[in-house]
């Protein structure tokens, strides 16, 4: 697959749907050494101590729950090696073939027993929506939705005695950027011609839930939503001269984004890490799934100071602070 197609098929949502459609009754995912270097197992596994969440229908039925899958689990690299001991292909052979795209299926000998307990609780969480009416009588009925997610992880497993996951960059900073944009657009004498919606969406960290609900059931007529601009975790660790418009190549917004960047003297840089599948991991994807043109404007990677490597700073943030208690306001901004 190309990067975008791979991102789609790599999403947990799509994997579960495909497995259920093909008759699976359970699924075990395995880690791999390449991802372990970027996101250590100990970091990722902390998230599994937190409850999963699903949207529910009006009658309380869970959305996208795939009841055919009775149990799922994920194993570390070492766990995968133990599971595949004696199999036709070892874990390390699978890891090697993963890098070359030459994986083949085989029957796994043995019996796996999974057990667990589930407690269900209904939780209400709200999106917050503000509206700036358009100034053009012919276009004011069209709406552009600016989004940023208002949630983070909250209280979780302690790291060095700290169990508060603050989410300063992910995504308090994104919310701040959206609110600042709303403030400036409202004060601008040249009022926007189309109506603007500023939507702080909930439960992004639980699977784009707030954005999915808004994109499916917006507060305005759905066919009046003409575009979405999303801001999520802008890693502004140094002054940059560019932005990264993720998903622009799949959107009719490309010419508009290019024109706006040209007016501001800002460069546009392709996604520097397409292997991270960010295209399907943030709120703009909920709008894409509903056929609404959307783009995720991420922080750039070209530092104004030629002695600073902005991409290295971004990579270090992902490795050391992403979804960690250390994502705090004392990081340089």
Model-derived regions: residue spans:
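Active-site-proximal beta-strand/loop segments in catalytic clefts of secreted hydrolases
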Residues: 1, 30-33, 75-78, 117, ...
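Extracellular/luminal Protease-associated
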Residues: 1-64, 68, 133, 141, ...
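Second-shell loop/turn segments in exported
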Residues: 1-16, 65-73, 80, 115-119, ...
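Short, solvent-exposed loop/turn and secondary-structure capping segments
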Residues: 2-4, 31, 37-44, 86, ...
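Acidic/histidine-rich catalytic neighborhood of metal-dependent amide-processing enzymes
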Residues: 8-18, 35, 154, 160-252
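Metal-dependent peptidase/peptidase-like ectodomains
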Residues: 54-91, 201-306, 312, 318
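Soluble metallo-hydrolase cores and metallopeptidase-like ectodomains found primarily
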Residues: 61-167, 183-187
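His/Asp/Glu-rich mid-to-C-terminal helical/loop segments that flank catalytic regions of hydrolases
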Residues: 183, 187, 298-333
